Amino acid sequence: MKKILTAICVAATTLTACNDNFLEKYPLTDLTEENAFKEYDNFKAFMNPCYEMFTNTTIHTSINNSYMNAQFYGDWYGGLVTHRDNARNPYAYQTITATADGGGWDFSYIRRVNIMLSHLNDGALTEAQAAHWRSVAYFFSAYWYMELIDRFGDVPWVNKVLDESSPESYGPRTPRAEVADSIVARLEYAAANIGNFNDGDNTVNANVVKAALSRFLLREGTWAKYHGLNEPYETYLRKCLTVSQELMDAYPTLYKGEDKQNQPATGYGEMWTTESLKGKPGVIFYKEFVNNVLMNRYNDFEHIAANSADVPQYTVDMFLMKNGLPIGNTASGYQGGKGKDMWGTFADRDPRLYQNIQPPYVVAPHKGAVDNVNTFKSWKFLKAGDNNQGHVVTADEAAKYRYYIDYMGANEKCLRGGSYGGEGMKRCPGQNWGAALTPVSPNLTTDSRVPYMRCRTGYYFWKNYDMWEFSTGSSAFCTADKPIFKIEEVLLNYAEAAWELQHFDQAVADKTINKLRDRAGVAHMTVADINDSFDPNRDKGNAPWWTGKGGKFGNYNVNPVLWEIRRERQIELFGEGFAFYDIRRWAKAAYYVNRQPCGLWTTATDNIYAPKANAYSGQFVDYEEIMRSGRASAENNSAGSGWIYTYESPLAHGGWLDTYYLSMVPTSQRALNKQLTQNPGYKELFGLSD
């Protein structure tokens, strides 16, 4: 019988030659191992396919064509976003299925790295060149192993080329602690020894390595602490402070943006909508897109019906007020809540909210003469006395309807993007790629005014939305670069590691979190003001939605200062795919995943977003009851007002299982290698045999 080998030893490795920068990595010339390592450029060509890790969709922070392709899943699984189209978070509703193959259990990149390492001493390279390529290889192997141990825990550590006769191909999983130490050692070697040999623009260098090291040291250090692993978590966190400080010294300023509208938090928003990130402050490494060479659909999706990312009420509530206070703080000045519309919810909030979620507005479609002040090519502002869908607009309503258009900048042309006349970054009102107007925000899926730019909760995700890019709504034509490593993450890594080591004070807050707040236009964090009552909604270890089948880990009272540090991370990195990594390393998955999602507060009879003609006809739910009891007792369509119902409580399906902290080892791999053990809980969950 033909022997089938585990992926560890037979993972396909195509030998390819590629161009010199991290733009596109398509093969140009086929090589064989016999002729692949004759000169320096051969090593470069052989390693270039490893850059595909940064677009690999099993990594939730990867950049792959659109938000919905990878980052959405990190935020969705992590409980910060929901799916518009009746798709439930599988970790919340226990719809995870047994994994037969795949699931990220893949060692093909590791095999490629090991093949290259085996040829470093063939005589084609100088000592310095060999150290450089060893460093590049160590970086890529460490980066992939970072994901493997985050996903599976113990995994086989493979540091040489294997074949079907190699006993290591059928060996056991290496303990997580050993793999973690090896990852750190490889990244530290790479940071110290990677050279400057002009491998091309935007390729792996010492600072890229340090950024990965900062990420891993925080991730693994906190995982070890909160999961009770026998790992030197304090050593990891101290190293995180050191390497993060080196990067903070190298990147002392943040990107402030270039849009003429000069919105608050412009630099924060434009990190995801700028045509070229080359040389931009704080950008360590990025995915480059170029017209007619390599393009994406990030912005494209957020103009059309295909954008299925929704934001629930509890995530909107996470964002601070502009004065730096949580909305539950009695001094916050929060104007939202029961009986309040979206303008009240958004009033005086952290401007990063407006860069992630489209603010509310109402305009009237228009055709005819224009003055480009109040009346534009395809729309006009509503004035007091105007008739809007059978409703006579009041003066207060007219002012409210236009407030965020003035704030974000008016979409004056409402034409097709690029050479067709689109201009600027985020603008209101919205439009699709056929220059069709979205006259109201939110454009609720139930009773929507137009069939695109719709949302179920009322909170429309538009992090990558801009007006200057061109698309057709069906193909990849967008060219805004996207960050992979940036100093903002490093600042947050430093702040969190400092708190875990009991070093967090006002000086640390000022050089990390308050730098981010200065750019966003949010009041500083004052550490001395953060006490037990600073945020009444803080996770104190007694959240009612913690009940269910999960709960072995994480039912602890989160320190008030740590709560604010974590909040800042979730706000600053929202929409980037970090959530599922973070809630698992904090051992807080049940807290974030088990919450029943819902949308904004509205009414059935006088819907402000689409008066009279398109009043909301969907179901309601009591969000206050959810916050009190963990779930709503009923979805009530007769009350006539309430928060928009989206999904039932995850607790009705059992909620988060602690089994999910690690992924299932694929059954096909265990069939090939009898020494591979299964992660805890999966045998019982799926009735698997040994």
Residue ranges and their predicted role:
Residues C18-N19, D106-Y109, S182, P264-S332, ...:
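Long, intrinsically disordered, low-complexity segments
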Residues P351-R517:
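C-terminal substrate/ligand-recognition segments
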Residues E147-P156, N198, F216-G228, E500-H503:
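Short coil/turn linking the two alpha-helices of tandem helical-hairpin repeats
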Residues N19-V81, E188-Y189, K210, L218-G430, ...:
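An aromatic- and glycine-enriched ligand-binding surface/loop that stacks and positions planar moieties
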Residues E39-H60, L80-F152, E168-D181, A185-D201, ...:
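Conserved, well-structured interaction surfaces
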